[in-house]
């Protein structure tokens, strides 16, 4: 699905979460590496506008939606966003496994155990006297792929052989 040449990716984000506009900017920058990929973003001022903003992205031709690590938007995923996207047969890609379990198509996400080990290693360095500012920011280099075969069947999307772990 994501291998299409022209792909419009919709992304909802909250203006109340300081990291969300940064995540959108990073997504737009990454999309420049893929000719034909376009990011359609829509800022959500508060939770009462989520339905309208989701519908707006769908009417602008979004081929799929991508969730950021945005608690405001994720909090309305199951009750507001997924019913609208499912009706339109538009997949939503989550940012972590729990979102895939509740109805997103797939996610290349963090492994919380790995994150915990990394945080523990950083804490040990700090306790050993390393200033926190001297410890580099950790990034995910090997995400875990999760998918939901039930959602794929409902949306009539073929899943490639062995893409990751099925959580349906």
Where are these regions (language model features)?
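Short hydrophobic alpha-helices and adjacent helix-cap/hinge residues
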Residues: 1-168
